[in-house]
Amino acid sequence: MMRLARFTQGFSFNKNVAKHRGSGSSNGTGNGSGTGNGQGLGGSCSANGLAATGGVGGGGGSGSGGGGCGSGSGSGSGKRKSKARTKCFGGTVFRCCLPCRGGGSAAPATSPPQTPAQTPDELKVIPEDCNLEKSAEQKRDLLERNNKEDDLLNRTVSGSELDLYGGAGGGTKKHSLADTIDTSVTTPISLKTLINDVDEELDQQLSAADIAAASLASGLVARRAEPETLSDASVSPTAVVQQQQQQQQQLQQPLLQSQPHFVPSSGNILSQVTLYSGSNPSTNPCQSAVQNQGQNSNPNPNQNPNTNPNQNQQRCSCQPQTSPLPHIKEEEESDQANFKHQTSLKEHQPLPPPITIATGYCGSCESVHHSSATSSSAGTVPPGGQQTQEYIAGTSSTPSPRIKLKFRKPHKSCWSRIVLAPIGSAGGSSSATTVIGSNSNETLASSSTTGGTATTTQNSSSVSVAAHHRLTSSSASALATSHPSNSQLLPTSKMQAEQGSIGDLQKYHSRYLKNRRHTLANVRFDVENGQGARSPLEGGSPSAGLVLQNLPQRRESFLYRSDSDFEMSPKSMSRNSSIASERFKEQEASILVDRSHGEDLIVTPFAQILASLRSVRNNLLSLTNVPASNKSRRPNQSSSASRSGNPPGAPLSQGEEAYTRLATDTIEELDWCLDQLETIQTHRSVSDMASLKFKRMLNKELSHFSESSRSGNQISEYICSTFLDKQQEFDLPSLRVEDNPELVAANAAAGQQSAGQYARSRSPRGPPMSQISGVKRPLSHTNSFTGERLPTFGVETPRENELGTLLGELDTWGIQIFSIGEFSVNRPLTCVAYTIFQSRELLTSLMIPPKTFLNFMSTLEDHYVKDNPFHNSLHAADVTQSTNVLLNTPALEGVFTPLEVGGALFAACIHDVDHPGLTNQFLVNSSSELALMYNDESVLENHHLAVAFKLLQNQGCDIFCNMQKKQRQTLRKMVIDIVLSTDMSKHMSLLADLKTMVETKKVAGSGVLLLDNYTDRIQVLENLVHCADLSNPTKPLPLYKRWVALLMEEFFLQGDKERESGMDISPMCDRHNATIEKSQVGFIDYIVHPLWETWADLVHPDAQDILDTLEENRDYYQSMIPPSPPPSGVDENPQEDRIRFQVTLEESDQENLAELEEGDESGGESTTTGTTGTTAASALSGAGGGGGGGGGMAPRTGGCQNQPQHGGM
């Protein structure tokens, strides 16, 4: 039925074409121009003088009927005859754009991007050299000899006529590589032809290009190409043929109804091709050609001024396709040299409309470009209607077919997504752009200028009219109009870089990753010394780099606010671009390098210094016009090196305004760098600069927070005393309580009253310090697992099925951990840890006996204090499960070794063992044995480590017994570092270190976080476990609320102890004055959100859902805060202004505030002041004083302490 359909259609075409026969002449170069009265539909495209795929050759066209990349070769009859197929190639490369493939179909990934080619089913006999002049008689003899080899299909319907509609006609002659030796060396064929046609029959085989074009024309959605594969089409050939038949039926009528008496000019090949305009889909496909004919009219019928014999070799303007493999660079260089020689011969000929392919390869550059509506012409049009436009030429890299065979790989996806950005003409034009399958990972903008307003329709012959209509319709919805921008499309996958679209992977990182926030390389190496690590820039690496996108717009943490007292430009976002001249900005935008790292905000001081110094270097190059030295140690990926390459504008001369402004800004930038460097203390690392800055900014934020409401003071003190390291407290611009004489005297008096009581209330002295307190004697269950069968989930439980269902979701964030604790008979840590180690096969890789593992976990869980509301084994199980989920982050896949993963999970299991339910500050203030043993430094964290490693010495509990000594030492070091990092007083230092490391790598130009040493790797793991420890606010709201209730109950129990012992009640530990809702808002704003913001930035976009949940929970608690009045009047004692946080009335006193305010009003000038911590009783006392002197010191009632809660400030 298919052959019958072709026969019928061909017969109707031939009958119609026969009406328009005329006389024509050939110019002897295979590029004749007809003078008859017929109309050559499909345009006057010709390539290399070859009679290739064509449309309906108009009568009288002696060679102007070709519609694809070839030219019609009819001898004045308008009816082209089919010819035997041979194949030829002169150089093949990886990919080709649409016009290079005859018949209007997209090219496969292996098609040449610079040289026209033809499909195997459409290729006919071709003259040996398109540049040699042949007489018409010789051509006819050659055609007659080849016509004898054709069958009935060749006599009835021309393969080239079907080709215009994407048909797959042609014979089934067997091909071999030997057939290509004696043919032309200027017209390559696709690699698919060479592979598929050798010693096998081709029965109407469709090319990948035809399939891709048909899938686009039919509205099919193209899938992205898989990494490390070449792009191709995988659509059913039957479906494609059906789509093509529908296109043929739709196009027959407009083609046959076209008006005769017209011969199009063949001046500019692509400008004479008819298509539907995206802005006017109903336009007659011949109208544009008629308009162009009026512009390109020529009195000489035999010679067109725009026609050039060498124009047959015009190639598309795809960017050069270079291979990243070093062993084929020599072949590429030789081919590039040959192409440059050929290009020099074509400088005098008219050039096709410019097309800039922002990605490495296109697939259908010209056809898609010309389907994008209209392009404005310049103010002046050269003779013949040729538009003067900028042509972006690139050298071609053409590996041999032998090399290409190595790149042919199986695939599962259609052609890659393409975004084209045509550049406006010299006179100025508004260039429309077309987007095919673009996504959020691709940045697109078309360069546009201002100029003339006259418009002409750009035409194309690469795909059928119906396909053009579909393409333009879909592209118009994606990008209706062009928008000016300086950014170009950046490659979206490492696959393109590996295939040669960028060159080598190092250049890929330099041009792409620098506009991304952070990148984490997927490499493995030994933890201690980094041996065995593969370079992430190694092209053969399975995942040489992970591109992490810019974060979406969301509320930023306080780290990005101004710190104007200490730096000139706090955000340093545009530190480079803000001081550069306009000419230098244009230079930056024109060469596709990062513009001061795009939208990123650099907040760490050391990274800001690096960015400023880089800016100074760039400005110096711009001012002096000295090219960057090739011997410079600056890497190629440095943005400054590429910026200084070829200045597009005239060099700045001394005396110009731009020169003076740039010089002044450079001096200011250098002064700022010097000021920052002079303040660095030599005994501290550069990360301490960020830590001190963040602490300083947090103190500023907390000062405003404490003044915003009456409860803000207590929350501010809690955050300062818990999350700020006391070791560097002297660097903070805050006043300690001891510096206030009056408060010292008041505290001394109060201390004398309670000294005896406090001394008597101290706990009895513990065991000798040579022993580790809290370690119990081995329990009976240690050797209880004597049978051969161990419990499925590590614990014996009657509800094993329900437990197994929940444990099956251990890789899910926000698991029902409380239900796991219930179903596991209060053994959540044992079952969670055992299941995770089993699923990750860590018991096998680390050679841990399962029985030994269960013995140790059971013993460890017994050493968690069950009476603690929060710090118990359920919290340890929650942190372990959260750590497991974070380790499964796609961005970290394959980064850490099993030893590192096992160490992180082990540290999460033990990080709070034998926790007494008290804070480090309480142990220090009470002079506990633990504080004395560990010198007040991370008291509990050191204790957790000591207990855990001591339990490993119990019989049958050493889970690392089969490890080598070096591995055991490495794991112990890792676990110690990770557990010590869970000390909340190290929070700011940990956050600053991570942010400094990330931003420094980003500013340095590499954009790749190598993690090639122990320090960097353990830093990521420390932050990972720290995030898991502070993950409660990021869990679903019901879980979060339950954890908050448990934590506050533990705080209140500590406050009760402090009250009973006569100690100062720690912030947020007084159950009578605590404000839970507002404390959680402050906790999220100043602690949790900055941490998770940095982590989400590192692994973007994998943690976006977690960050969204955090913001939702914060909004919930913000909505639950009761309205709070502003602080009361001004303090009478000016000396009290020096105190950091003044304890004021709480929200619980709202009922008494009205009475207090009435007393203030009746008392005239009397004001209510509180010099020390006050409670509801003091408020009542002040109000009862009427207008006399209300608000004074009230006696203690109800056990409340009349003492300042400085919280370690």
Swiss-Prot record:
Q: Where is this site: Binds AMP, but not cAMP?
A: 1032
Query: Where a divalent metal cation 1 is bound, by residue?
Result: 875, 911-912, 1029
Q: Name the PROSITE patterns on file.
A: PDEASE_I_1, PDEASE_I_2
* Stretches with biased composition (Acidic residues): 1146-1163
Stretches for region Disordered: 16-35, 59-82, 275-353, 372-403, 442-498, 626-655, 754-792, 1146-1209
Q: Which top EC class is named for this enzyme in its record?
A: hydrolase
Where is the PDEase domain positioned along the sequence? Answer: 795-1124
Residues of the active site: 871
Gene3D superfamilies, alphabetized:
3'5'-cyclic nucleotide phosphodiesterase, catalytic domain
Give the residues the record marks as binding 3',5'-cyclic AMP.
Answer: 871-875, 912, 1029, 1080
Its UniProt entry gives the catalysed reaction(s) as: 3',5'-cyclic AMP + H2O = AMP + H(+)
Enumerate the SUPFAM superfamilies for this protein.
HD-domain/PDEase-like
Q: Entry cofactor note text?
A: Binds 2 divalent metal cations per subunit. Site 1 may preferentially bind zinc ions, while site 2 has a preference for magnesium and/or manganese ions.
Annotated pathway, please? Purine metabolism; 3',5'-cyclic AMP degradation; AMP from 3',5'-cyclic AMP: step 1/1
How is the quaternary structure described? Monomer.
What protein name does the entry list?
A: 3',5'-cyclic-AMP phosphodiesterase, isoform I
Task: Specify the species.
Answer: Drosophila melanogaster (Fruit fly)
